[in-house]
Amino acid sequence: MINALKGMKDLQDDQATLYEKVVKTCEEVAKNYGFTFINCPHLELTKLFKRSVGESSDIVGKEMYEFVDKAGNDVCLRPEGTAGVVRSYIEAKMDKNQSVKRWFYHGSMFRYERPQKGRLREFHQFGVESFGVESVYEDASIILMLDEIFKRLKIHTNLKINSLGCKECMGVYKEKLIAFLNSKDGFCEDCLRRKELNPIRVLDCKNDHCQNLIKNAPKLSENLCPCCKKDYEKLQKILSENGIEFECDEKLVRGLDYYSKSAFEFISDEIGAKAAVAGGGRYDRLIEYLDGKSGYGVGFAMGIERIMAILEQKQDIKKRNGIYLCAMDEAYIDTIFKLANTLRKKHKVYLSYEAKKLAKHLNQADNANAKIFLCIGEDEMQKEEIFYKNLDTKENKNIKIANLENEL
């Protein structure tokens, strides 16, 4: 038997329904904020991610599905969504006149890492990207959008924010941080690599020993230039005035190298240990990194599997819906086929083409998770009626077929 690859799984039935619910909720909120859908390829040139995500990131260092294709191109399956959307923005020459574009996307991402709860090798993300807007109000708007999504999904989260500064103040901060890191010994292998490539990523280490080593590290907030400090304070003011609770976290740097200025994460403890379920920030330099004209960008990405894991614990995803329509005699199949065609204009209909006894039909309706059971037998046909049963309330009665739409 051929099985799915390790860390990759099918979405079927209840899981597929839950996936659709999460994506639909995200899409509805994103559209209300003026965002439109973009769909980018799953396969891109590897250099796109080496330039954008950064050589110091775990993704580029050890997690990419990378290979050489038949034409000799070094390509990889996308490990995240932002770089591809930025590439699309530049390729369409929208960067030349700083076009304002607001896009949302969703789909598969791929990382070769150890599979665990809420973390797969093929996983799904929902994300948004906004281009051409410098104002910190856009950063706040992106955060408010995510907050609204979680409210609609009834998921409790905690928001953490930070400012990574711009190129100028980050340069000063890195010098102080490097001096501090060089005075410490005992970092893990990942931190030793990060220290050489991008020292600020050491702050992102989840190793308890490393966290203890850096507990007195220089603070980003104390090294921001006046402009970045003003924007960070303004962001906090906007969030507070709009009823958004948050925590300022000096060690929040995100796992990708392209962030600058605003960075944020939404944390939930409803998946077990506190884990990030969404995060993002501003990446004004990324467009320039990818050979575009220097501009503005901000966005977020959400891990759909982690959201689904929370909802599975909180909600009854097997809530009944739809109509199961059947007949007890083959002579009436044509009748229910025509009736199904009419009902499907407004309702979800499961149609059985086989004539069976009532008990067997009821069993199939239960397996289909239908809410309404409709069946025609000889007696019903003679009276131009149909047998109706609500599988939630167990109410049952005969209804005139001509009045069926009004009764449903």
UniProtKB/Swiss-Prot annotation:
GO biological process: histidyl-tRNA aminoacylation
PROSITE patterns: AA_TRNA_LIGASE_II
Keywords carried by this UniProt record: Aminoacyl-tRNA synthetase, ATP-binding, Cytoplasm, Ligase, Nucleotide-binding, Protein biosynthesis
Gene3D superfamilies reported for this sequence: Anticodon-binding domain, Bira Bifunctional Protein, Domain 2
EC code(s) of this entry: 6.1.1.21
Main location: cytoplasm
Cell compartment(s), UniProt: Cytoplasm
One Gene Ontology CC term in the entry: cytoplasm
Annotated disulfide bonds: none
Domain of life, per lineage: Bacteria
Recorded catalytic activity of this chain's protein: tRNA(His) + L-histidine + ATP = L-histidyl-tRNA(His) + AMP + diphosphate + H(+)
One Pfam family here: tRNA-synt_His
Keyword check for Acetylation: no
Record text on subunit structure and interactions: Homodimer.
Protein family membership: Belongs to the class-II aminoacyl-tRNA synthetase family.
Protein name: Histidine--tRNA ligase
Species annotation: Campylobacter lari (strain RM2100 / D67 / ATCC BAA-1060)
Gene name tied to this protein: hisS
